[in-house]
Amino acid sequence: MPQTRLTDRFGRTVNYVRLSVTDRCDFRCVYCMAEDMTFLPRQQVLTLEEIARLARNFVALGTEKIRLTGGEPLVRRDILELVREVGTYGLRDFAMTTNGSQLPTMAESLRKAGLQRLNISLDSLDADKFRAITRTGNLSQVLDGIDAARDAGFRGIKLNTVVMKGRNDEEIPELIEFARQKQVDISFIEEMPLGEISEHDRGLALCTSEEVRDIIRRHHELIPATEDSGGPARYFRMPDSEVRVGFISPHSHNFCSTCNRVRVTVEGRLLLCLGNEHSVDLRRVLRGHPVTDDKLQEAIIKAMDLKPERHHFSSNGDVQILRFMNTTGG
């Protein structure tokens, strides 16, 4: 792995890239997108070859960790071909975030293709609540997907739960017990103010990480984990389990000072910060210079100067970023 060349003006090293492969999804989660979402025209979406080229050049610039995101990555046709290709790039960490719906049939193939870790969204263990949050999701299918991932030999499996008051906050103890039973880590996430939603008031629904910890501590002691997560989560352990409990707290405890990541949307926009609109059009560079990579790497390096010191999310429920999470890359 080469010495990184991606450093922003605040001295932060950027070695983690989240690549969105689609804005489409078979769910319509209330915190992620509108129910009648209009998806991008095909011609605006990067080809899998373009995504692989981006990944290859980020690795050439020192990237050690790549996560494939969406939308739902597993609804992208021929996604296994991309996984096989990126899996040959010598990454320290190669992961995917998924809603789990396609894992019953795809988990084993993903593991054999070289994917190392999976983050699986699980916002409820109640079938009716799960359907209400996802609008279209089938809980049993996702639970089967979690089992399929374990059976396929994935050792780095983590559950992600977006906690919302009045929707799923009372399920926190049950979700902890489920993670302990399955021997997988779980992270609780404060809802992020991306895109205008109508299902609930984000300010009223916000459940802070400290509130979640207070609920868990009624049942389990939480001991801060010593290892570096390499991401935004702050991890804790329980004395009687190897399972880690993580907290991603963009509102109550932002992780900006140690931010080591950027995102590329499926349109090829390089986003320097989840909570800012600063971006660089890498699709134009990819298609304008299809043969050589010099201009592409130059654009990526130069873009680091645009990375802001921090985001400015507020907890009042207002929309701070107009783009939805599915177009950002979850």
Swiss-Prot record:
UniProt: [4Fe-4S] cluster 2 binding residues: C256, C259, C273
Cofactor detail note: Binds 2 [4Fe-4S] clusters. Binds 1 [4Fe-4S] cluster coordinated with 3 cysteines and an exchangeable S-adenosyl-L-methionine and 1 [4Fe-4S] cluster coordinated with 3 cysteines and the GTP-derived substrate.
Binding site for [4Fe-4S] cluster 1: C25, C29, C32
Pfam families: Fer4_12, Mob_synth_C, Radical_SAM
Keyword Cell wall biogenesis/degradation applies: no
E.C. no: 4.1.99.22
Catalysed reactions listed for this entry: GTP + AH2 + S-adenosyl-L-methionine = (8S)-3',8-cyclo-7,8-dihydroguanosine 5'-triphosphate + 5'-deoxyadenosine + L-methionine + A + H(+)
Radical SAM core domain residues: 9-225
Metabolic or biological pathway: Cofactor biosynthesis; molybdopterin biosynthesis
Single GO molecular function: 4 iron, 4 sulfur cluster binding
List of residues binding GTP: R18, R67, T97, K158, R261, V262, R263
UniProt cross-references to InterPro entries, sorted A to Z: Aldolase_TIM, Elp3/MiaA/NifB-like_rSAM, MoaA, MoaA_NifB_PqqE_Fe-S-bd_CS, MoaA_twitch, MoCo_biosynth_MoaA/MoaC, rSAM
GO process annotations (BP): Mo-molybdopterin cofactor biosynthetic process
Residues that bind S-adenosyl-L-methionine: Y31, G71, S121, M192
Entry keyword set: 4Fe-4S, GTP-binding, Iron, Iron-sulfur, Lyase, Metal-binding, Molybdenum cofactor biosynthesis, Nucleotide-binding, S-adenosyl-L-methionine
Entry cofactors: [4Fe-4S] cluster
Top EC class of this enzyme: lyase
Family: Belongs to the radical SAM superfamily. MoaA family.
The protein's assembly and partners: Monomer and homodimer.
Reported function: Catalyzes the cyclization of GTP to (8S)-3',8-cyclo-7,8-dihydroguanosine 5'-triphosphate.
PANTHER family (UniProt xref): MOLYBDENUM COFACTOR BIOSYNTHESIS PROTEIN 1, MOLYBDOPTERIN COFACTOR SYNTHESIS PROTEIN A
NCBIfam families assigned: moaA (TIGR02666), PRK00164.2-1 (NF001199)
UniProt-recorded name of the protein: GTP 3',8-cyclase
Organism, as annotated: Marinobacter nauticus (strain ATCC 700491 / DSM 11845 / VT8)
Gene: moaA
